[in-house]
């Protein structure tokens, strides 16, 4: 056989042998992967739990290793309450990580409520223990910190699970969530504070998209119904100050709190509020008294009412559920 033809024949035989070896090894590789698992297979399995609302399954694969008070919302109840959960579009083939052959990286392309984002998982090869599906373990799961604070909103709930909110933007409380679109409900408001629920989008915590929520800050507003209670309490206090016997109360003007006073009449009582502040202080129209102490005097007073708040800025109420309000009067 000529040298050229012999060379071509040898090349052909080599190629055929290579293909034959590849086909021969395929069952071996398949068996190894079945026994040991694959990095991308572990990522797919983990993401399937999150997509299906199975927080317990995801936690069984990767635990965040944090105190219980920070992981209150990593439950099936909360994850299934999400109005939208992740959809897995693709999972890449594994590539070597920084730790050499025993570390791999897998990038997943995900979609949440129409917004697409990617997340890269780091995995490492470990000894396979009983119950493990793979020798490959995800280092860090998809746990996202959400800082929560509130003005006049001491607590909040998601999916029936409640927790405390921080008192201000400078001191929020952080909680972990799995990816999803959640509704945060304000709690602990009482009858005289209004606050809106807020929609919170949790992706992967990178905040690469403006769609993802960076923090939650509730804003509780004093209810307008407080104005009616302020007028009611102010009128009651003014009538008490215009009545002999109760005119000696500390909230009454000093001019009326004299043993020389023999008669008092309330000539004018405020009908409206002139101003209101966020701290629960209200200014009312002036009131006018006429009193006698040997001679007749007209007394015009400035009327101010203050709603008593607890430490969270929530109006305190009495046994009947009415707000506690103090009224002061000063001579004009």
What are these regions (language model features)?
Residues 1-8:
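Terminal targeting segments of Actinobacterial cell-envelope proteins
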Residues 31-78, 153, 221-260:
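Core segments of small alpha/beta cavity-forming domains
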Residues 94-167, 171-174, 283-332:
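Exposed beta-sheet edge and beta->alpha loop/turn motif
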Residues 174-191:
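A short, solvent-exposed beta-strand micro-motif common in secreted/extracellular proteins
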Residues 189-224, 311-312:
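Structured interaction patches on ligand/partner-binding surfaces of diverse proteins
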Residues 224, 228, 232-332:
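Membrane-lipid interaction segments
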């Amino acid at each position: 056989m000529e040298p050229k033809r012999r060379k071509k024949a040898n090349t052909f035989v080599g190629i055929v042998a290579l293909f034959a070896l590849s086909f021969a090894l395929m069952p071996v590789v398949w068996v190894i992967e079945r026994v040991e698992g694959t990095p991308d297979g572990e990522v797919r399995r983990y993401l399937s739990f999150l997509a299906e609302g199975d927080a317990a399954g995801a936690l069984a694969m990767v635990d965040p290793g944090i105190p219980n008070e920070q992981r209150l919302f990593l439950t099936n109840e909360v994850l299934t309450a999400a109005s939208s959960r992740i959809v897995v579009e693709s999972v890449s083939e594994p590539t070597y990580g920084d730790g050499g052959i025993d570390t791999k990286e897998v990038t997943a392309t995900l979609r949440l409520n129409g917004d697409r984002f990617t997340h890269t998982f780091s995995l490492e090869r470990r000894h396979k223990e009983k119950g493990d599906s793979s020798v490959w373990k995800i280092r860090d799961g998809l746990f996202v910190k959400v800082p929560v604070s509130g003005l006049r909103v001491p607590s909040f709930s998601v999916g029936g699970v409640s927790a405390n909110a921080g008192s201000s933007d400078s001191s929020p409380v952080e909680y972990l969530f799995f990816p999803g679109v959640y509704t945060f409900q304000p709690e602990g408001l009482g009858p005289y504070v209004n606050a809106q629920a807020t929609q919170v989008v949790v992706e992967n915590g990178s905040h690469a998209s403006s769609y993802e929520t960076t923090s939650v800050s509730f804003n509780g507003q004093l209810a307008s119904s407080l104005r009616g209670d302020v007028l009611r309490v102010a009128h009651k206090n003014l009538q008490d100050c215009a009545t002999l016997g109760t005119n000696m109360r500390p909230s009454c003007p000093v001019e009326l709190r004299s043993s020389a006073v023999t008669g008092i009449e309330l000539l004018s009582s405020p009908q409206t509020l002139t101003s209101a502040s966020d701290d629960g202080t209200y200014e009312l129209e002036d009131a006018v008294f006429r009193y006698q102490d040997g001679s007749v005097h007209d007394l015009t007073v400035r009327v101010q009412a203050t709603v008593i708040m607890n430490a969270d800025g929530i109006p305190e109420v009495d046994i009947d559920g009415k707000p506690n309000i103090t009224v002061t009067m000063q001579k004009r």
